[in-house]
């Protein structure tokens, strides 16, 4: 089973934004092979969003040889909780204020592959640490600005998630 898993050369990435959500298939070197997108704001429920996302994934998965070529999926999302694989009370996603949404499990059920989820700024920091300008850096902060504002904090080469999974959520900071 392990040898079979290692032969799967691609992963799916989802950058879930408050306005648009972009799906991509990436190889082991971080090269984006193909993408598709949907309007995040077009869906009233998480279930509708996941169904539309799976439909958007079908043609790009087919381009790389089918789901059997996909090892896993990673999601970067506002208010994403790495520990739980959930989006929690996300005000900048139409269906996000419904409470705690088990988005990783929802996609995993539909696709039949493992799915991980983290805060979108943390995902950006991890990407920069592995493939971008933060390669080799042990300590840095990645600031993101889109529909919301966030940060991914890296200390001693490790992502800081905090005790509850929400370290770096700058958009929820009260400044007086």
Report each predicted region and the residues it spans:
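Glycine/GP-enriched mid-protein hinge/lid loop-to-helix segment characteristic of carbohydrate kinases
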Residues: 2, 8, 26, 34-37, ...
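Conserved catalytic-loop position in the HRD/HxD motif
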Residues: 15
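Conserved Rossmann-like nucleotide-cofactor binding loop
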Residues: 19, 31
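N-terminal phosphate-binding loop and adjacent alpha-helix
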Residues: 32-69, 99
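Glycine-rich phosphate-binding loop and adjoining helix at the ATP-binding site
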Residues: 46-54, 69-73, 79-139
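Short glycine-rich anion-binding loops that position phosphate/pyrophosphate groups of nucleotides
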Residues: 78-81, 146-148
């Amino acid at each position: 089973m392990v040898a079979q898993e290692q032969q799967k050369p691609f992963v799916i990435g989802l950058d879930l934004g408050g306005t648009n959500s972009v799906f991509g298939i990436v190889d082991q070197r971080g090269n984006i092979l193909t993408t598709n997108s949907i309007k995040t704001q077009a869906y009233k429920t998480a279930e509708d969003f996941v169904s539309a996302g799976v439909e958007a994934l079908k043609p790009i998965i087919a381009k790389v040889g089918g789901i059997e070529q996909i090892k896993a999926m990673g999601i970067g999302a506002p208010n994403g909780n790495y520990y739980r694989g959930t989006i929690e009370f996300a005000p900048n996603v139409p269906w996000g204020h419904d409470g705690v949404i088990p988005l990783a499990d929802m996609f995993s059920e539909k696709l039949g592959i493992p799915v991980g989820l983290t805060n979108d700024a943390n995902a950006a920091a991890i990407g920069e640490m592995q493939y971008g300008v933060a390669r080799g850096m042990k300590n840095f902060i990645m600031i993101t600005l889109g529909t919301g504002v966030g940060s991914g904090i890296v200390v001693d080469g490790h992502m800081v998630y905090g005790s509850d999974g929400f370290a770096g959520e700058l958009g929820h900071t009260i400044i007086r």
